Amino acid sequence: MSFASETKKELTNLEVKPCCLKAELSALLRMNGLLSFSNQQILVDVQTENAAIARRIYTLLKKGYTVTVELLVRKKMRLKKNNVYIVRIIDGAHELLKDLKILKEDFSLIRVISPELVKKKCCKRSYLRGAFLAGGSVNNPETSSYHLEIFSLYEEHNNSLCELMNSHFFLNAKTLERKKGFITYLKEAEKISEFLNIIGAHQALLRFEDIRIVRDMRNSVNRLVNCETANLNKTIGAALRQVENIRYIDETIGLSALPDKLREIAELRMMYQDVTLKELGELVSGGKISKSGINHRLRKIDEIAERLRAGKPVDFHKSL
């Protein structure tokens, strides 16, 4: 089962307050409901491939309203032959949709979230929970980038949902148009954690945070290793260049032509090619020399080698 499916399964088992039932149900029916007319009466079909969500809708309807509800199961005939669960509302559908602030008296759609549904903070949380159950998805934090989104068919509802997430819960949600609708999405791991907490998915939140901590630690270790590897490669490259320059000087004018301080460093570098500058400074006779001091002398040796290659005269009095 995917991380998103596990999250939704957890949400369908939550208890809901009487004041919050309407908010969650409104989101579920608004986003997954299909309105039709049969024998001069309104029918509402709510379709989902998730049995737990279908059961949740059925339970909320039975708990909050005196409407006639049927639960049907169909088999998809194309591609994946999954079950499709249909919660069908027959009698009292119009009054129900008016009460849920989805339809007006004249049967026109209300495409924004009604303030009456989300007066309390707990009801705001419940509406977001219903919206996530109806059209939400969240990436597995182990295998991909952090991403949570909720799909809406209508732009007005999508903007209203984004406003609810940002103005009341400061989630920094953003909107985007897709081919068949619109999405409100989160990209920041911290905001996704906050959203899971808001809608009551506490087990999913704990798992998300555990994975996130391990992932962040792994990334930190990788960055550190990459940094150390880069530094090591830089150090090795510098040492090889120094040895090559010292050999060139030895083959052209001889190391004995160098000033004593430079000759000593050149000879030590040839003898100890794999030691660090700090370790090289500890090998100098007559007292320890700092890393910067050793680096200064090796740069002078590099300059001498480059001048010799270019056929330019070398002034050894300026080499220290």
From Swiss-Prot:
This is Probable cell division protein WhiA. The lineage of its organism: Bacteria, Bacillati, Bacillota, Bacilli, Bacillales. Belongs to the WhiA family. GO terms for biological process: cell division; regulation of sporulation. HAMAP family: HTH_type_WhiA. GO terms for molecular function: DNA binding. Gene3D superfamilies: Homing endonucleases (3.10.28.10). It holds the Pfam family HTH_WhiA. Keywords: Cell cycle, Cell division, DNA-binding. It comes from the Bacteria. InterPro entries: Homing_endonucl, Sporu_reg_WhiA_N_dom, Sporulation_regulator_WhiA, Sporulation_regulator_WhiA_C, WhiA_LAGLIDADG_dom.
